[in-house]
């Protein structure tokens, strides 16, 4: 027996002993040692074997953990066999059922021999399927159930759970031993002795309880291990023997079943030979008869071959060739703004290009390459048709039905002609629009966030695209992607391969940053992500873990049902990143969705195709390339190809056919997708399916999709300048980057700089102040602009001050920042992060400072018109810095709410039609739009020297003077009152000084007395007198004083305006009644239902008011004016 000292030293150095893993103790030795210790504690040597017991338990625990892992894998494999077997049984039953039905058809058509053969094969399949079903039941009962019981019972939990009671007993023993040892050493020290060792006999009685508890837990653990050994060894093998017998019975019974048909099969083979001989003879006779008939008709074989030589089918509308491929004339084009006004435009078609002229001759016409456009007739209006380009839809209307047919035919013929030329190689490189489009898309893809470096290792300038994931990689990482297989990643080169637009759908919508935000959300630290200098081994380990195992992806769902719900929501909301998130969590993309109201068994791909349009093809493309099984059928037997034909989705069909699905699958109605396309006359789908069936489909196909490229497009439009915001519900989009001032550059000079921007986010100007510079269209083609679609705006509160007509503004004050339909300056460029929308104006051309050659007016020391404009512009900029409104720069997708523009209180110079005669309103609208750019160096002539046809720039800039109506040759006929918008707002005009500012300044000496007299004469003697309700002098002065409070100076040299007069009059409470339901899109908006009454407490801008529900002051916020009706109390 070892001494107590040596045993104690072994305890103090137990870590090194355990690392060397000393001798273990067997079950028989443990029983012997424990029995001896129980009978004679003082003479027992059990205390020397304690560490052996603990080592044994540790080794047993490790062995159990290894067995647990192996058994879990066995269980997973067996379950996979069982599930695939169930699928096989189901498929066999379906096969037998269809085969039986097919044989019954033969029996009913007087072919009993063949029908009987099919029925017998169907019966054989059913019997074999029954045997296989029994075998699978044996596998489930004998193997799967046994493994489940073991893993969920004795082996349940994780490593270490089983030995926790043993570890506690060991710890208690060690603690008690240390305490006793310390006490005995202290006792010896008190008596002047030193204890170097403690014998086992001394502590045997004191440690008996802890030793017995340790022995008990050791016994319990060994008993549990013994039971597990039995279940995982003997019991499992006994059940495998049972399954072996089930397999033997399966094969023996299957062989017996097959032997029953052996004699019948031999007889059937001979009968089939005779039937084949009969049919061959019948075919030979029919062939001879056909040749006889053809020879009697004396067909010209050459003409017959030429007639059968098919040209290229565009899968689109075919035009009447009599109209040719060129045409010039006029079409009505519906604007893309909110009001949807029909505008008459001069159009021409030549050489595959449609040219659309603008309202003014000084703007370059828009040119559309018809190769990337599709003509679509309007089913509701026989004179209207749509022209769908790659990034925009144009709505046209012909003068009559005959003209409509001519335009449709010419557009279609011109496109077909251009396409034929392209295939013959006769089209120049500059006109190859498809290649240009593909190049533009690739450039746009390379500009996406994170696409400047490899998605996996961070190498710069990646040029290899994973078409099914939408990411860019370097050449080293792309090689590993290829090794993983096309079911994981499909690699193409942006430079070496000739890509179709369909292969760029995901790349345009994903990007490396967005993809890695999902797939690398849980990267461990330190990060295993390779660097550009990493070797291929490191890259392969990381890429395999990332794309195959999804090891680093974000996990948001815990159950399979939650994942399916997320998959459904991603499809319904058309959120590609949400779809990638579900994919990263390992959901089966072709699992049937439990969505009420849809066909039973419908998958996510079925739903995506059924609801697809030109803006959601990327969702379909992701599902097609990553789902694996494109032949999944619904309860009615419809595949996704059937859905494409049923719902006429040719673009989705192109994406599907790239992955080569089975095209001849029939549904329960016995129809293939091609049969449905023929029945529903879906010609595009029919042609595509026919090509796929004959193996002629080109996978590098072009798809019609809303690309929304951020580069400068060739499809320009003046709709942004022609249209004004109207009270129609539209989403309030984020504002553009602001413009600010410096002490050395005027606002006009800064606006002339192409890239001018400011980091300040709050000091912003409404982009509409620069783009929407035209109020009334002055097109020479169409003098009228009907606005019946826009409801009239409610009158403003009188407490805001009287209004003055825009026509009283001196025209010379508009020279710096003003604009008109005759001389339009292009607006400033969008901010760098701005994504170009369909309604964005073209980028500005570089031009010189706008103030060059401006002539000062008044005395020599007075401010020039340019400086006046600067003051007004800065005031508007400062005013807009305090507003939280939105601008009109968002994408033109699903417009709902009118935008909350930054210039809120700019309606004080609007004209109320109810108080102003029609002539004043018409002429004031025209004069507000005339060109305001005087020739350099021209001095203003005297009023008596004005010619009958004055130039706008030559008019003397006298405040308040209303000049005669200009007679420029390019002005349109005078618009009528009915053609004007409901209420012109100064927010739609560029920033410019107001009459009130000038009159206010004249009172302080900024304007000479001589400059004030013509104002009075004009207001009194001009034929365009105001109505009695508008007192010109008082109103203008009052308005000037009110406006001055809104214009806060921002520069030292800016003259300080007069303080605003505070309106002390008590405003009348305004009440409005809601006429529609409205759901708030932002936190500061008000949600209401039809019929509620709102108390108006303020106005955010012309189209958004502030208020609360009557009787419920806690329900407050902004609301669109077009959704309410003003109550007259």
Swiss-Prot record:
Boundaries of each SH3 domain copy?
Answer: 1067-1129
- A Pfam family name for this chain? BAR_3
Q: Where is the composition biased (Basic and acidic residues)?
A: 723-734
Instruction: Report keywords, A-Z.
Output: ANK repeat, Cilium biogenesis/degradation, Cytoplasm, Golgi apparatus, GTPase activation, Membrane, Metal-binding, Phosphoprotein, Repeat, SH3 domain, Zinc, Zinc-finger
Where composition is biased (Polar residues), the residues are: 735-747, 862-872, 1001-1018
Q: Where is the composition biased (Low complexity)?
A: 777-788, 809-822, 876-889
Cellular component (GO) terms are: centriolar satellite; cytosol; Golgi apparatus; Golgi membrane; plasma membrane; podosome; trans-Golgi network membrane
Instruction: Give me the ANK repeat coordinates as residue ranges.
Output: 600-632, 636-665
Positions of modified residues (Phosphothreonine)? 1048
According to the UniProt record, list the residues that bear Phosphoserine: 717, 726, 839, 843, 1008, 1027, 1041, 1128
Locate the region Disordered. Answer: 713-760, 776-1062
Q: What is its main location?
A: cytoplasm
ZnF C4-type: positions: 454-477
Q: Give the GO biological process terms.
A: cilium assembly; positive regulation of membrane tubulation; protein localization to cilium
Where does the record place the Arf-GAP domain? 439-560
Q: Which domain of life is it from?
A: Eukaryota
Q: Where in the cell is it found?
A: Cytoplasm; Membrane; Golgi apparatus; Golgi apparatus, trans-Golgi network
Q: What is known of its domains?
A: The PH domain most probably contributes to the phosphoinositide-dependent regulation of ADP ribosylation factors.
UniProt-listed PANTHER family: ARF-GAP WITH SH3 DOMAIN, ANK REPEAT AND PH DOMAIN-CONTAINING PROTEIN 1, ASAP FAMILY MEMBER
Protein name listed in UniProt: Arf-GAP with SH3 domain, ANK repeat and PH domain-containing protein 1
Question: What is the source species?
Answer: Homo sapiens
Q: Which gene encodes it?
A: ASAP1
């Amino acid at each position: 027996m070892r001494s107590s000292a040596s045993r104690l030293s072994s305890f103090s150095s137990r870590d090194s002993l355990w690392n060397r893993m000393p001798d273990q103790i067997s079950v028989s030795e443990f029983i012997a040692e424990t029995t001896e210790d129980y009978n004679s504690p003082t003479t027992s040597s059990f205390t020397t074997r304690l560490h052996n017991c603990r080592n044994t338990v540790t080794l047993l625990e490790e062995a159990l953990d290894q067995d647990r892992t192996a058994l879990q894998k066995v269980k997973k494999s067996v379950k996979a066999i069982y599930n695939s077997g169930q699928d096989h049984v189901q498929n066999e039953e379906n096969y037998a059922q269809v085969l039986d039905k097919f044989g019954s058809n033969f029996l009913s058509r007087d072919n009993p021999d063949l029908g009987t053969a099919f029925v017998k094969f169907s019966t054989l399949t059913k019997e074999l399927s029954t045997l296989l079903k029994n075998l699978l039941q044996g596998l489930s009962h004998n193997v799967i159930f046994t493994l489940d019981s073991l893993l969920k019972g004795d082996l349940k939990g994780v490593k270490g759970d089983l030995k926790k009671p043993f570890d506690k007993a060991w710890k208690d023993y060690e603690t008690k031993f240390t305490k006793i040892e310390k006490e005995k050493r202290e006792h010896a020290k008190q008596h002047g002795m030193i204890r170097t060792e403690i014998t086992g006999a001394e502590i045997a009685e004191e440690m008996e309880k802890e030793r017995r508890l340790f022995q008990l837990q050791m016994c319990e653990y060994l008993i549990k291990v013994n039971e597990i050994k039995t279940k995982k060894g003997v019991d499992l093998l006994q059940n495998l023997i049972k399954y072996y017998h089930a397999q033997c019975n399966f094969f023996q019974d299957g062989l017996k079943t097959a032997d029953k048909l052996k004699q019948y099969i031999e007889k059937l083979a001979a009968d089939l030979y005779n039937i084949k001989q009969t049919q061959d003879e019948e075919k030979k006779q029919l062939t001879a008869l056909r040749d006889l008939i053809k020879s009697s008709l004396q067909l010209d074989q050459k003409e017959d071959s030429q007639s059968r030589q098919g040209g290229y089918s565009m899968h689109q509308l075919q035009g009447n060739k009599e109209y040719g491929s060129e045409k010039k004339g006029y079409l009505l084009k519906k604007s893309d703004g909110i009001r949807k006004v029909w505008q008459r435009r001069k159009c021409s078609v030549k050489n595959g290009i449609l040219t659309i002229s603008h309202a003014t001759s000084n703007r370059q016409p828009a040119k559309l390459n018809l190769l990337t456009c599709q003509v679509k007739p309007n089913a509701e209006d026989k004179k209207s048709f749509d022209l769908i380009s790659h990034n925009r839809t144009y709505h046209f209307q012909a003068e009559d039905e005959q003209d409509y047919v001519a335009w449709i035919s010419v557009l279609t013929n011109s496109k077909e002609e251009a396409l034929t030329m392209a295939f013959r190689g006769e089209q120049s490189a500059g006109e190859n629009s498809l290649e240009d489009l593909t190049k533009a898309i690739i450039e746009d893809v390379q500009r996406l966030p994170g696409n400047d470096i490899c998605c996996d290792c961070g190498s710069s300038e990646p040029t290899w695209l994973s078409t099914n994931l939408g990411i860019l990689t370097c050449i080293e990482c792309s090689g590993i992607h290829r090794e993983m297989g096309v079911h994981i990643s499909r690699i193409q080169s942006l430079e070496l391969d000739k890509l179709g637009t369909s292969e760029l759908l995901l790349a345009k919508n994903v990007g490396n940053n967005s993809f890695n935000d999902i797939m690398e959300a849980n990267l461990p630290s330190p990060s295993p992500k390779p660097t550009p200098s990493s070797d291929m081994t490191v890259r392969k380990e990381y890429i395999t873990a990332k794309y195959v195992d999804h090891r680093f992806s974000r996990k948001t769902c815990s159950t399979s049902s939650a994942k399916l719900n997320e998959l459904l929501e991603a499809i319904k909301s058309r959120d590609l990143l949400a779809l990638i998130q579900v994919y990263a969590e390992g959901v089966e993309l072709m699992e049937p969705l439990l969505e009420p109201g849809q066909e039973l068994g419908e998958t996510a791909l079925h739903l995506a195709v059924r609801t697809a349009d030109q803006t959601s093809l990327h969702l379909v493309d992701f599902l097609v390339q990553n789902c694996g099984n494109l032949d999944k059928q619904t309860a009615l037997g419809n595949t996704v190809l059937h859905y494409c034909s049923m719902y006429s989705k040719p673009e989705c069909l192109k994406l599907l056919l790239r992955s080569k699905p089975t095209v001849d699958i029939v549904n329960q109605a016995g129809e293939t997708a091609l049969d449905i396309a023929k029945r529903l006359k879906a010609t595009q789908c029919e042609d595509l399916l026919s090509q796929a069936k004959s193996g002629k489909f080109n996978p590098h196909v072009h798809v019609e999709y809303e690309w929304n490229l951020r580069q400068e497009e060739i499809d320009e439009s003046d709709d942004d300048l022609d249209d004004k915001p109207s009270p129609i519900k539209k989403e309030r989009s984020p504002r553009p980057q602001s413009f600010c001032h410096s002490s050395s550059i005027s606002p006009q000079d800064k606006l002339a700089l192409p890239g001018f921007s400011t980091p300040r986010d709050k000091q912003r100007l409404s982009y509409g102040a620069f783009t929407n510079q035209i109020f009334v269209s002055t097109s020479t083609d169409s003098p009228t602009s009907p606005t019946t679609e826009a409801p009239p705006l409610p009158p403003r509160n009188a407490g805001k001050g009287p209004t003055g007509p825009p026509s009283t503004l001196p025209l010379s004050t508009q020279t710096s920042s003003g604009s008109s339909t005759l001389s339009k300056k292009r607006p400033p460029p969008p901010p760098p992060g701005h994504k170009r929308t369909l309604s964005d104006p073209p980028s500005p051309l570089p031009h010189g400072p706008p103030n060059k050659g401006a002539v000062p007016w008044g005395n020599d020391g007075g401010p020039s018109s340019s400086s006046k404009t600067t003051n007004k512009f800065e005031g508007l900029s400062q005013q807009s810095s305090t507003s939280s409104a939105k601008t009109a720069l968002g994408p033109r997708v699903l417009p709902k709410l009118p935008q909350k523009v930054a210039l809120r209180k700019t309606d004080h110079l609007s004209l109320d039609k109810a108080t102003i005669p029609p002539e004043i309103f018409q002429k004031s609208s025209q004069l507000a739009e005339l060109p305001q750019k005087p020739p350099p160096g021209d001095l203003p002539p005297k009023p008596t020297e004005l010619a009958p046809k004055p130039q706008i720039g030559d008019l003397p800039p006298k405040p308040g003077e209303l000049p005669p109506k200009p007679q420029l040759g390019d002005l349109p006929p005078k618009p009528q009152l009915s053609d004007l918008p409901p209420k012109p707002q100064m927010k739609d005009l560029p920033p410019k000084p107001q009459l009130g500012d000038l009159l206010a300044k004249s009172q302080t000496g900024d304007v000479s007395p001589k400059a004030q007299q013509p104002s009075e004469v004009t207001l009194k003697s001009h034929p365009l007198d105001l109505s009695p309700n508008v007192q010109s002098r008082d109103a203008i002065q009052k308005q000037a004083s009110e406006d001055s409070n809104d214009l806060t100076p921002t520069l030292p040299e800016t003259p300080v305006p007069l303080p605003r007069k505070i309106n002390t009059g008590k405003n009348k409470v305004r009440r409005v009644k809601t006429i529609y339901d409205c759901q708030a899109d932002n936190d500061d908006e008000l949600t209401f239902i039809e019929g509620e009454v709102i108390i108006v407490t303020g106005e955010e801008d012309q189209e958004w008011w502030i208020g609360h529900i009557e009787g419920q002051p806690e329900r407050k916020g902004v609301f669109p004016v077009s959704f309410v009706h003003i109550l007259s109390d």
